[in-house]
Amino acid sequence: MANIDTPIPALKLNDGNSIPMLGYGTGTAWYKSGDEDKIDEKLVESIQTAIKLGYYHLDGAEVYKTEPELSMAIKKSGVAREKLFVTTKVITNIADIQNAIKTSLKKLQLDYVDLYLIHAPFFAKTDSDLQRAWAEMEAVQSSGLAKSIGVSNYLPQHLEATLKTAKVVPAINQIEFHPYLQHPPLLAFHKQHGIATAAYGPLSAVTKAAPGPVDDFMKALEKKYAVSAAEISLRWCIDQDIVAITTSGKGFWTNKFDANDRS
C-alpha cells in the first residue's frame, strides 16, 4: 500500500454529507467464521496501516464480525474521530435495527457512524418488510446514531418499494461493480433519484476474473500511464462518481496517476 500523494476526493450525498471516494473494507476477505471475541491481529494491523497512509474511509459490517478489530485499529491510530468516515451495515439483526446500531456502536466504541446501510434486501418477503426496515433506518438517523443512511445490494425493484413510503431517500447503494458487472439500469435509477453508488469488488476484473476480455486494454493503460491494473480499476470507478471500496493491500495512487487527476 502506498502513501496517498493527494487528498482522496469526496462525493456529496443527497443529505448534504460528503463521503471519501476511496474506502478500505473489512469485509468478505476478513470474515470471521469463529468467535467474534477472538481478535484478528492481522486485520487490526492492516486497518492501522491504511489509516496511517491516509485511508480514512473505513467500511465494515456486523455480519463480518470485524467491528471489534475496526474499533481497536481506530483507537490505536490516534486519528481524531471527525477525520474518519466509518460505515457499518445491518443484516443479522435486521428485525431490530435500532438495537442493532447500538450493538454495533458498542463494538466500534463510537458514538455514531457516518454511514449505516441495510446490507441486503433478501430478508424481505414483501415490500412492506423493506418499507418497515427503512422506516427504522430513518429513526436511526433522526436519533443521531448515523449521519447518513443507505442500502446495499438493492436492485431497482427494492428501491422502488422502499421509496413508496420513504421520508428520506437512501443516500447510497453499495453494490458489486466492476467492468464485468456494470448494472446500467440500476445506475440510471440511482441517478434519477439522487442516490449515490458505492462499489465493492472493484478490482474483480483484474483479480478474480483474470484472465478476461479487459486484460489487453488494462495492459495498454498500465504501460501508457505506468500504473497498476488495480489503480486503473479504482480510477475507473471514481471517474464515474462511484465510491470504490477495496480490501486490497496494494498501492493505489501515484504522482503520475492520482485520484484528483481527471485528464
Question: Where do the language-model regions lie?
Answer:
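N-terminal binding-site loop/beta-alpha segment at the start of enzyme catalytic domains
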Residues: 1-83, 136, 204
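Generic structural signal for well-ordered alpha-helices
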Residues: 8, 47, 67, 71-74, ...
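Short acidic capping loops at alpha-helix termini that bridge into adjacent secondary structure
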Residues: 21, 81-84, 111-115, 147-148, ...
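Acidic-and-aromatic substrate-binding clefts and catalytic sites of carbohydrate-active enzymes
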Residues: 31-33, 59-69, 91-97, 123-127, ...
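Short, acidic/polar
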Residues: 33-51, 94-109, 130, 157-160, ...
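A short, structured active-site edge motif that brings together acidic residues
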Residues: 81-94, 115-121, 177
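CE4/NodB-like, metal-dependent polysaccharide N-deacetylase domain
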Residues: 98-118, 139-143
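Beta/alpha (TIM)-barrel catalytic core signal, keyed to glycine-rich beta->alpha loops juxtaposed to Asp/Glu
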Residues: 120-263
